[in-house]
Amino acid sequence: MAEAADTEVQTTSLEPQARHIVYCGVCSLPPEYCEFGGTAKKCEEWLHENNPSMHQKLYSEETIAANLSTLSIQARERAAKDAAKKEAKAALVETRNQERKAAAKVQIKRVERNKRKHVTVIAGLEAHGLDNKKVAKELGKKFATGSSVTKNPAGGEEITVQGDVCEDVLEWLVEVHGKEVPEDNLEIVEDKKKKKAAAE
């Protein structure tokens, strides 16, 4: 019986153990690979704040000196230029995304379906980082009506809510998703067909 107990202890210690891996909060890669992305400087700052021991291991002066000593002078210069290019490119992409997000308009439209039936169509939320399906579900619950995500002819997605709730949707978006979608980017678009019909 003592032999059986000994074999059990040995077999349990031979089983593979799970490893705890730290992932970067900026680029979502392990910190060892952050240098290959475009956000190396931000990744280093994040690691310094959140895991100082690993930061010391990866970015200490001795480690950097050891890594640089294996490179030739030309390779060092190339590595420095590449790192600068990657950082500049990442900064440019980030500013473009912010500009695009600031310029993106969310259009809320009232569309006539039948003689007295209307739907409200909301387009452009995905540009502000909102998930159309989740927002459609929230709208359906909020207004107790049918709400779905549909494809528009241009190939994008839009949310269709049954009923004429343009003003209410505008107020709700400002109240609930005001951080993601600034009020200046929300606009109610009038249906041009109705204006023509009213003019005649």
Curated annotation (Swiss-Prot):
Gene3D superfamilies xref list: SUI1-like domain
Broad class of the protein's primary localization: cytoplasm
Keyword field contains Cytoplasm: yes
The organism's place on the tree of life at top rank: Eukaryota
Pfam families (UniProt xref): DENR_N, SUI1
UniProt GO MF annotations: mRNA binding; translation initiation factor activity
CDD domains (alphabetical): DENR_C
GO cellular component: cytoplasm; ribonucleoprotein complex; ribosome
Coiled coil: none
Key words of the record: Cytoplasm, Ribonucleoprotein, Ribosomal protein
Cellular location(s): Cytoplasm
GO biological process annotation, one example: translation reinitiation
PANTHER family, A to Z: DENSITY-REGULATED PROTEIN (PTHR12789:SF0), DENSITY-REGULATED PROTEIN HOMOLOG (PTHR12789)
Family statement drawn from the similarity comment of this UniProt entry: Belongs to the DENR family.
Record remark on domains: The SUI1 domain may be involved in RNA binding.
Designated name of the protein: Translation machinery-associated protein 22
Source species of the chain: Coccidioides immitis (strain RS)
Organism lineage string: Eukaryota, Fungi, Dikarya, Ascomycota, Pezizomycotina
